[in-house]
Amino acid sequence: MPNQEKMEKAIYQFLEALGENPNREGLKDTPKRVAKMYIEMFSGLNQDPKEQFTAVFSENHEEVVIVKDIPFYSMCEHHLVPFYGKAHIAYLPNDGRVTGLSKLARAVEVASKRPQLQERLTAQVAQALEDALAPKGIFVMIEAEHMCMTMRGIKKPGSKTITTVARGLYKDDRYERQEILSLIQKG
């Protein structure tokens, strides 16, 4: 569990190290606000994305299921600045095992609420789905803008990073993978 008191002290000291007066009017509550914000933003640290699949059903459905444009935000573990974008998840049920659609979005939410790398986030979402449903195929695509590339360093706002993970049928069969990509990219 996060230690809010310890976080507040560290933020207070950080403000001092910047040369600021943490006791001035505009900053006196900042350590508390920032600590509470980080506790919320990193709330996925003590959760498992796989545990979000609480509703698994046996249906007579053997065709692809796609949930796309799932908005998310996360924090780059290298610079502790946000990256945000959309996740797209496709899976081909195995023996008719399907899940509630919101469970896919919840898995993204939990996996993204921690210091993270986009590549790892993509893999964690795919692994959670594989563990929960054991589908015939999984395809996860995440596209995001990273503030560490927008606000600092190279300063290229609007640039997007795309990561994918393909498993099962979507890894082994190039035609099937192309079909999923085409469906995801349709407006």
Curated annotation (Swiss-Prot):
Signal peptide: none
GO CC annotation, single: cytoplasm
Keywords: GTP-binding, Hydrolase, Metal-binding, Nucleotide-binding, One-carbon metabolism, Zinc
EC number: 3.5.4.16
An example Gene Ontology molecular-function term: GTP cyclohydrolase I activity
Catalyses which reaction(s): GTP + H2O = 7,8-dihydroneopterin 3'-triphosphate + formate + H(+)
Domain of life: Bacteria
Claim: DNA-binding is one of the keywords in the record: no
Family matches, as Pfam families: GTP_cyclohydroI
UniProt-listed GO biological process terms: one-carbon metabolic process; tetrahydrobiopterin biosynthetic process; tetrahydrofolate biosynthetic process
The protein's annotated pathway: Cofactor biosynthesis; 7,8-dihydroneopterin triphosphate biosynthesis; 7,8-dihydroneopterin triphosphate from GTP: step 1/1
Protein residues bound to Zn(2+): C76, H79, C148
NCBIfam families tied to this protein: folE (TIGR00063), PRK09347.1-2 (NF006825), PRK09347.1-3 (NF006826)
Subunit structure comment from the entry: Toroid-shaped homodecamer, composed of two pentamers of five dimers.
Family classification: Belongs to the GTP cyclohydrolase I family.
Name of the protein: GTP cyclohydrolase 1
Organism from which the protein derives: Streptococcus agalactiae serotype V (strain ATCC BAA-611 / 2603 V/R)
